[in-house]
Amino acid sequence: MRIKEHLKQLKPYQPGKPIEAVKSEYGLDKVVKLASNENPYGCSEAAKEALHHEIQQLALYPDGYSAALRTRLSKHLNVSETSLIFGNGSDEIIQIICRAFLNDKTNTVTAAPTFPQYKHNAVIEGAEVREIALRPDGSHDLDAMLEAIDEQTQVVWICSPNNPTGTYTSEGELLAFLERVPSRVLVVLDEAYYEYVTAEDYPETVPLLSKYSNLMILRTFSKAYGLAALRVGYGIADENLIRQIEPAREPFNTSRLGQAAAIAALDDQAFIASCVEQNNAGLQQYYDFAKTHGLKCYPSQTNFVLIDFKRPADELFQALLEKGYIVRSGNALGFPTSLRITIGTKEQNEEILAILAEIL
C-alpha cells in the first residue's frame, strides 16, 4: 500500500487536553477550558429541550437534505433554500470545497497564520497552497492575496474575523477585493464568529451573494450558538454553485440531534444577544489587563483574544495548565510568544488574569 506523498507532510489535528485528563494528571478538582472558543454559557435551553424528542429516534437516519433546518435557516437569512449546503461542522464544508475544486494542477490562496483547515484539506487534494502573511495589525493583506492569484488559482480563503487574531476584513476592503478578483475564482468567506461581530464597518455579506456568484459564506452553530458537540455548519452561495458541489457531500452528514437543536437555537436570538453582551464585557477585561501590563492584544471581533506576552508561549501554557486553565499556545498558531484565550465568564476571566498577573 502506498499513501499519497503529499499526505506524509501533514499531521493529524491535535486537540487540547480533555478536562478530565488534566484533572487526573495534575491532581486538580477544578479545570477551566478556555482553549477551543466554545461558548462558556452553553446553549439555549430551547435547544436542549428540542433534543428530548429526537433522542427517541436514534435508530432512524437523519433527513439527508436537512429540510426542516433548511427552511428555518433560509427564512432567518432571507435566502432561497437551494442556496444552502450543510456540513458536519463548517470544517466539512471546507473539505467539500477542496474536494470539488482542487487537485495537483491547481493552487489556492490563503492568509497566514489563519484557520489551518484550509491548507490541510488543500494539501490532501494535492494543490499548491500560496500563503500570504498577515499585515502587522493581524488582518488579511487582500492586495497581496490578489497578486498571488494566477490562471491555476481555484479558491481564495478569507477568514473574517480571522482565527487566531480575531481581526476582520472591513466592508470597503472586501468590496474592493471582490470587484478585482477574477470571477472564475471562488472566494470563500469563513464567518465562523459572525454572531460576535460588533464593528460598524463589518460587511453584511449575505446580500453580496446576489452580485458575486463566485462568493461563498461559511457559518456554524458551534460557536455563539453553543452546539459544538453536535457539529452543524453551513455554506451560503449561488444556487448553481451549491448544486455543483453537493455531490461531494457525504450522505446523512448532519445528525437528527444537530438539526433539531439548530432549529431551536435559531428561534432563541435573545440567548445570542445575551452571550454577545457578556462576551464584549469579557473582552474588555482582557484589554484592560493587556494595557496595565504593557502587552499587545489584538482587537477582537470574536469570543477569544490573542495576547503577546513577549515570552515563550509554551511555558505560559504549561504554567496555566498546572493551575487548571487550558488555553491555546500561540506556538502552534504562528505566534510563538502569544496565547489565544477564549473569553470565559466574568469569574473565569478574573481568575485566569489573576494567575497571569502573578506569573508576569
Swiss-Prot record:
Matches recorded under InterPro entries: Aminotrans_II_pyridoxalP_BS, Aminotransferase_I/II_large, HisP_aminotrans, HistidinolP_aminotransfase, PyrdxlP-dep_Trfase, PyrdxlP-dep_Trfase_major, PyrdxlP-dep_Trfase_small
GO biological process: L-histidine biosynthetic process
Source domain of life: Bacteria
One Pfam family cited in the UniProt record for this chain: Aminotran_1_2
Associated pathway: Amino-acid biosynthesis; L-histidine biosynthesis; L-histidine from 5-phospho-alpha-D-ribose 1-diphosphate: step 7/9
SUPFAM superfamilies: PLP-dependent transferases (SSF53383)
Residues with N6-(pyridoxal phosphate)lysine modification: 223
Top-tier EC class: transferase
UniProt GO MF annotations: histidinol-phosphate transaminase activity; pyridoxal phosphate binding
EC number: 2.6.1.9
Disulphide-bridged cysteine pairs: none
Cofactor entry: pyridoxal 5'-phosphate
Key words of the record: Amino-acid biosynthesis, Aminotransferase, Histidine biosynthesis, Pyridoxal phosphate, Transferase
Family in the record: Belongs to the class-II pyridoxal-phosphate-dependent aminotransferase family. Histidinol-phosphate aminotransferase subfamily.
Assembly and binders: Homodimer.
PANTHER family recorded: HISTIDINOL-PHOSPHATE AMINOTRANSFERASE, HISTIDINOL-PHOSPHATE AMINOTRANSFERASE 2
HAMAP family: HisC_aminotrans_2
The name this protein goes by in its record: Histidinol-phosphate aminotransferase
Species per Swiss-Prot/TrEMBL record: Bacillus subtilis (strain 168)
